[in-house]
Amino acid sequence: MGYRHGIYISELATSITPPVQVSAGLIVAFGTAPVNQLEDPASAVNKPIIAYTYAEAVSKIGYSTNFEKYTLSEVIKVAFGIYGVAPVVFINVLDPAKHKKDVTDELVKLSGGKGTLSNDGVLYKSVVVKKADGDSPGLTLDTDYVLALDDNGYTVITAISGGKITEKDATLKVSYTHLDPGAVTKNDIIGGVDSNTKANTGLELLSDVYPRFKLVPGQVIA
Protein backbone atom coordinates (compact mmCIF):
# COMPACT_ATOMS: atom_id res chain seq x y z
CA MET A 1 0.00 0.00 0.00
CA GLY A 2 1.45 3.35 -1.05
CA TYR A 3 1.57 6.44 1.15
CA ARG A 4 1.35 10.06 -0.01
CA HIS A 5 4.30 12.20 0.98
CA GLY A 6 4.61 15.98 0.85
CA ILE A 7 2.01 18.75 0.80
CA TYR A 8 -1.28 18.38 -1.09
CA ILE A 9 -4.20 20.76 -1.52
CA SER A 10 -7.89 19.89 -1.72
CA GLU A 11 -10.69 22.38 -2.37
CA LEU A 12 -14.28 22.30 -1.14
CA ALA A 13 -17.14 24.32 -2.60
CA THR A 14 -17.97 27.39 -0.52
CA SER A 15 -21.38 27.64 1.13
CA ILE A 16 -21.70 31.19 -0.21
CA THR A 17 -23.22 31.35 -3.66
CA PRO A 18 -21.68 34.16 -5.72
CA PRO A 19 -24.03 36.34 -7.78
CA VAL A 20 -24.73 35.08 -11.29
CA GLN A 21 -23.91 37.85 -13.73
CA VAL A 22 -26.28 38.21 -16.66
CA SER A 23 -26.36 40.48 -19.69
CA ALA A 24 -29.99 39.76 -20.57
CA GLY A 25 -32.98 40.47 -18.35
CA LEU A 26 -31.17 43.30 -16.58
CA ILE A 27 -33.18 44.46 -13.56
CA VAL A 28 -33.74 48.20 -13.33
CA ALA A 29 -35.42 49.08 -10.03
CA PHE A 30 -37.08 52.42 -9.23
CA GLY A 31 -37.94 53.26 -5.64
CA THR A 32 -36.75 54.77 -2.39
CA ALA A 33 -33.43 54.31 -0.59
CA PRO A 34 -32.04 55.52 2.78
CA VAL A 35 -29.59 57.90 1.12
CA ASN A 36 -29.06 59.70 4.43
CA GLN A 37 -26.46 57.00 5.08
CA LEU A 38 -24.27 58.37 2.28
CA GLU A 39 -21.63 61.06 2.57
CA ASP A 40 -23.45 62.99 -0.16
CA PRO A 41 -27.15 61.98 -0.18
CA ALA A 42 -27.93 64.13 -3.24
CA SER A 43 -25.47 62.12 -5.34
CA ALA A 44 -27.85 59.13 -5.39
CA VAL A 45 -31.05 60.91 -6.46
CA ASN A 46 -32.56 60.34 -9.93
CA LYS A 47 -29.39 58.74 -11.20
CA PRO A 48 -28.89 55.19 -12.54
CA ILE A 49 -26.54 53.38 -10.15
CA ILE A 50 -25.24 49.92 -11.03
CA ALA A 51 -24.13 47.35 -8.46
CA TYR A 52 -22.68 43.85 -8.85
CA THR A 53 -22.67 42.80 -5.19
CA TYR A 54 -24.66 43.27 -1.99
CA ALA A 55 -21.88 45.32 -0.39
CA GLU A 56 -21.50 47.56 -3.42
CA ALA A 57 -25.23 48.30 -3.50
CA VAL A 58 -25.30 49.15 0.20
CA SER A 59 -22.31 51.47 -0.14
CA LYS A 60 -23.89 53.31 -3.07
CA ILE A 61 -27.52 53.76 -1.96
CA GLY A 62 -27.66 52.68 1.71
CA TYR A 63 -29.70 49.86 3.25
CA SER A 64 -32.55 49.48 5.72
CA THR A 65 -34.58 46.52 6.92
CA ASN A 66 -37.70 48.71 6.72
CA PHE A 67 -38.69 47.60 3.23
CA GLU A 68 -42.03 49.42 3.39
CA LYS A 69 -40.26 52.76 3.60
CA TYR A 70 -37.18 51.96 1.55
CA THR A 71 -38.25 49.75 -1.33
CA LEU A 72 -34.85 49.51 -3.01
CA SER A 73 -33.47 47.81 0.10
CA GLU A 74 -35.85 44.93 -0.55
CA VAL A 75 -34.52 44.67 -4.11
CA ILE A 76 -30.97 44.49 -2.72
CA LYS A 77 -32.00 41.71 -0.34
CA VAL A 78 -33.84 39.66 -2.96
CA ALA A 79 -31.43 40.12 -5.89
CA PHE A 80 -28.14 39.68 -4.04
CA GLY A 81 -29.07 38.03 -0.76
CA ILE A 82 -31.57 35.42 -1.95
CA TYR A 83 -31.29 34.79 -5.70
CA GLY A 84 -27.72 35.94 -6.36
CA VAL A 85 -28.44 37.83 -9.59
CA ALA A 86 -26.17 40.63 -10.81
CA PRO A 87 -25.86 43.32 -11.92
CA VAL A 88 -28.84 45.43 -10.86
CA VAL A 89 -29.43 49.09 -11.73
CA PHE A 90 -31.02 51.15 -8.95
CA ILE A 91 -32.75 54.50 -9.43
CA ASN A 92 -33.69 56.25 -6.21
CA VAL A 93 -36.39 58.95 -6.46
CA LEU A 94 -36.39 59.87 -2.76
CA ASP A 95 -34.94 63.38 -2.80
CA PRO A 96 -33.70 64.71 0.58
CA ALA A 97 -34.19 68.24 -0.72
CA LYS A 98 -37.94 67.61 -1.24
CA HIS A 99 -39.08 64.54 0.66
CA LYS A 100 -38.19 65.51 4.21
CA LYS A 101 -39.54 66.55 7.61
CA ASP A 102 -38.08 68.91 10.19
CA VAL A 103 -38.02 68.12 13.91
CA THR A 104 -37.40 70.90 16.45
CA ASP A 105 -36.13 70.39 20.01
CA GLU A 106 -36.87 66.69 20.38
CA LEU A 107 -36.07 65.71 23.97
CA VAL A 108 -33.62 62.82 24.08
CA LYS A 109 -32.89 61.19 27.43
CA LEU A 110 -29.43 59.65 27.59
CA SER A 111 -28.83 56.37 29.36
CA GLY A 112 -25.23 55.53 30.06
CA GLY A 113 -24.21 58.42 27.83
CA LYS A 114 -26.27 57.23 24.85
CA GLY A 115 -29.64 58.21 23.39
CA THR A 116 -31.57 57.36 20.22
CA LEU A 117 -33.56 59.75 18.03
CA SER A 118 -37.20 58.80 17.41
CA ASN A 119 -37.03 58.96 13.59
CA ASP A 120 -34.91 57.09 11.08
CA GLY A 121 -33.46 58.61 7.90
CA VAL A 122 -31.79 61.46 9.79
CA LEU A 123 -29.64 63.77 7.67
CA TYR A 124 -26.51 64.16 9.77
CA LYS A 125 -25.55 67.61 8.53
CA SER A 126 -28.87 68.97 9.82
CA VAL A 127 -28.44 67.77 13.41
CA VAL A 128 -28.20 70.44 16.13
CA VAL A 129 -27.75 69.23 19.72
CA LYS A 130 -28.20 71.34 22.87
CA LYS A 131 -28.50 70.67 26.56
CA ALA A 132 -32.13 70.69 27.67
CA ASP A 133 -31.54 73.09 30.56
CA GLY A 134 -32.26 76.66 29.45
CA ASP A 135 -30.74 78.35 26.42
CA SER A 136 -27.32 76.72 26.57
CA PRO A 137 -25.18 76.99 23.42
CA GLY A 138 -25.15 74.16 20.94
CA LEU A 139 -22.88 71.19 21.44
CA THR A 140 -20.15 70.29 18.95
CA LEU A 141 -20.09 67.11 16.86
CA ASP A 142 -16.97 64.96 17.41
CA THR A 143 -16.06 67.11 20.42
CA ASP A 144 -19.05 66.73 22.72
CA TYR A 145 -20.85 63.86 21.00
CA VAL A 146 -20.75 61.46 18.04
CA LEU A 147 -23.52 60.14 15.79
CA ALA A 148 -23.90 56.57 14.58
CA LEU A 149 -26.57 54.28 13.14
CA ASP A 150 -27.99 51.33 15.02
CA ASP A 151 -28.98 48.08 13.31
CA ASN A 152 -32.46 49.45 12.54
CA GLY A 153 -31.25 52.65 10.89
CA TYR A 154 -31.93 54.97 13.83
CA THR A 155 -29.41 57.59 14.90
CA VAL A 156 -27.66 57.12 18.24
CA ILE A 157 -26.08 60.07 20.06
CA THR A 158 -23.13 59.15 22.27
CA ALA A 159 -21.53 61.62 24.66
CA ILE A 160 -17.75 61.97 24.41
CA SER A 161 -15.77 61.79 27.63
CA GLY A 162 -14.29 65.19 28.39
CA GLY A 163 -16.95 67.05 26.41
CA LYS A 164 -19.70 69.36 27.63
CA ILE A 165 -22.14 66.50 28.32
CA THR A 166 -21.00 65.68 31.83
CA GLU A 167 -23.98 63.61 33.03
CA LYS A 168 -24.44 60.12 31.61
CA ASP A 169 -28.22 60.44 32.07
CA ALA A 170 -28.53 63.99 30.74
CA THR A 171 -31.48 65.17 28.64
CA LEU A 172 -30.70 66.84 25.32
CA LYS A 173 -32.68 68.96 22.86
CA VAL A 174 -32.09 67.78 19.31
CA SER A 175 -33.29 69.46 16.11
CA TYR A 176 -32.83 67.73 12.77
CA THR A 177 -34.24 66.90 9.35
CA HIS A 178 -35.12 63.36 8.34
CA LEU A 179 -36.22 61.66 5.14
CA ASP A 180 -39.94 61.28 4.49
CA PRO A 181 -40.46 58.36 2.08
CA GLY A 182 -44.22 58.79 2.47
CA ALA A 183 -43.98 62.07 0.58
CA VAL A 184 -42.85 60.28 -2.59
CA THR A 185 -45.72 60.10 -5.09
CA LYS A 186 -46.41 58.24 -8.32
CA ASN A 187 -45.40 61.39 -10.17
CA ASP A 188 -41.90 61.09 -8.69
CA ILE A 189 -41.70 57.53 -10.02
CA ILE A 190 -43.08 58.45 -13.45
CA GLY A 191 -40.77 61.45 -13.66
CA GLY A 192 -40.04 63.25 -16.90
CA VAL A 193 -37.60 65.93 -18.02
CA ASP A 194 -36.77 68.68 -15.52
CA SER A 195 -37.74 72.00 -17.11
CA ASN A 196 -34.84 73.81 -15.42
CA THR A 197 -31.93 71.37 -15.65
CA LYS A 198 -33.20 69.40 -18.69
CA ALA A 199 -32.21 66.25 -16.80
CA ASN A 200 -34.26 63.06 -16.92
CA THR A 201 -36.06 61.96 -13.76
CA GLY A 202 -38.01 58.87 -12.72
CA LEU A 203 -38.87 56.33 -15.41
CA GLU A 204 -37.47 58.68 -18.04
CA LEU A 205 -34.04 57.57 -16.80
CA LEU A 206 -34.54 54.19 -18.48
CA SER A 207 -33.17 55.81 -21.62
CA ASP A 208 -29.95 56.62 -19.73
CA VAL A 209 -29.16 53.02 -18.75
CA TYR A 210 -27.74 51.75 -22.04
CA PRO A 211 -25.59 54.83 -22.79
CA ARG A 212 -24.09 54.63 -19.29
CA PHE A 213 -23.54 50.90 -18.85
CA LYS A 214 -23.89 49.36 -22.34
CA LEU A 215 -26.55 47.04 -20.92
CA VAL A 216 -30.14 46.77 -22.15
CA PRO A 217 -32.89 46.98 -19.51
CA GLY A 218 -34.83 43.73 -19.31
CA GLN A 219 -37.01 43.88 -16.18
CA VAL A 220 -38.33 47.14 -14.77
CA ILE A 221 -39.44 47.26 -11.12
CA ALA A 222 -41.20 50.30 -9.66
Task: Identify the meaning behind each predicted range.
Residues M1-A222:
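Surface-exposed assembly/interface segments
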